[in-house]
């Protein structure tokens, strides 16, 4: 398989490794990106890749709560100029209120529901597109429920570039639930705790760490012990309750939650545009296109 400059660039972005190392890794693994990451890690060249998806598309996240129900959604636009537009911000609030009140199962069902004036949600969004002049997309949403004995934690970072919704069970301390949401926004854990990590993922990490230790020339008799120690650090990176609490690093998130008399039932974290590839236009051209379009 031909190794392209774009593939090398992507691997460099994901691992921080040098260009020649990335090219060699891709060549050795026949262009398989995931295997190339493992190859670099096993050689000790790259740290554990936080396979963060490239954040590209624009828009906002938004959170709406009403009693024991809460909703988090993401509405995309083509540019961040539009995301700051009053019409866009009014639309996201209207959609949030509708979705929380009507609880559709998914985006497809939501688009067919009737909103104000007998229009469908899809028609309502299309009207906003006609006024604003950009493609707008209701990308995703999630509705979460709790009891009177629980608390929601809602946090929007940078005006909605990242949105996090948490549920603290057995405690009505909304401030604590929000503090956990702020931690999640900053650190981006993949799981609540170790039990949520699949056996396959743990075994894969164990194999990579074992090969890494052997390549470092460590004696086989101490490799297993080293690997278990490094696995602990792996869990700290991806499991929320194992992480040092951002607001008090001397305490784990688990200890903070327990000190409030609750348990963390779940969380949802949206970052605008994660996983969406954006057309890489020249920025000056993008601005000129907008100026021309406004004439």
From Swiss-Prot:
Record's keyword annotation contains Cytoplasm: yes
SUPFAM superfamilies documented for this protein: Elongation factor Ts (EF-Ts), dimerisation domain (SSF54713), UBA-like (SSF46934)
UniProt keyword terms in alphabetical order: Cytoplasm, Elongation factor, Protein biosynthesis
InterPro entries membership: EF-Ts_dimer_sf, Transl_elong_EFTs/EF1B, Transl_elong_EFTs/EF1B_dimer, Transl_elong_Ts_CS, UBA-like_sf
Stored Pfam families: EF_TS
GO CC term (a single one): cytoplasm
Region listing for Involved in Mg(2+) ion dislocation from EF-Tu, in residue ranges: 79-82
Single GO molecular function: translation elongation factor activity
Functional note: Associates with the EF-Tu.GDP complex and induces the exchange of GDP to GTP. It remains bound to the aminoacyl-tRNA.EF-Tu.GTP complex up to the GTP hydrolysis stage on the ribosome.
PANTHER family documented for this protein: ELONGATION FACTOR TS (PTHR11741), ELONGATION FACTOR TS, MITOCHONDRIAL (PTHR11741:SF0)
Family: Belongs to the EF-Ts family.
Designated name of the protein: Elongation factor Ts
Gene that produces this protein: tsf
């Amino acid at each position: 398989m031909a190794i392209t400059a774009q593939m090398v660039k992507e691997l460099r972005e994901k691992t921080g490794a040098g260009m020649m190392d990335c090219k060699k890794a891709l060549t050795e693994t026949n262009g398989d990106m995931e295997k190339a990451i493992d190859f670099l890690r096993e050689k000790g060249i790259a740290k554990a890749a936080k396979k963060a998806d490239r954040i590209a598309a624009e828009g906002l996240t938004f959170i709406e709560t009403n009693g024991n129900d809460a909703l988090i959604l993401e509405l995309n636009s083509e540019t961040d100029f539009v995301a700051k537009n009053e019409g866009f911000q009014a639309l996201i609030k209207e959609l949030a209120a509708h979705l929380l009140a009507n609880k559709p199962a998914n985006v497809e069902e939501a688009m067919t529901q009737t909103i104000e004036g007998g229009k469908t949600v899809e028609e309502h969004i299309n009207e906003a597109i006609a006024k604003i002049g950009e493609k707008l997309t209701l990308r995703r949403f999630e509705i979460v429920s709790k009891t009177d004995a629980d608390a929601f934690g809602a946090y929007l970072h940078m005006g909605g570039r990242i949105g996090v919704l948490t549920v603290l069970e057995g405690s009505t301390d909304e401030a604590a639930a929000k503090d956990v949401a702020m931690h999640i926004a900053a650190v981006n854990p993949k799981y609540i705790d170790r039990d949520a990590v699949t056996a396959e993922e743990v075994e894969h990490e164990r194999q990579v760490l074992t090969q890494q230790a052997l390549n470092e020339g460590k004696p086989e008799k101490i490799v297993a012990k080293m690997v278990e120690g490094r696995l602990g650090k792996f869990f700290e990176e991806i499991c929320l309750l194992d992480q040092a609490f951002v607001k008090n690093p001397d305490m784990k998130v688990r200890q903070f939650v327990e000190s409030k008399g609750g348990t963390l039932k779940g969380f949802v974290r949206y970052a605008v545009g994660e996983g969406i590839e954006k057309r890489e236009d020249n920025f000056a051209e993008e601005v000129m296109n907008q100026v021309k379009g406004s004439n």
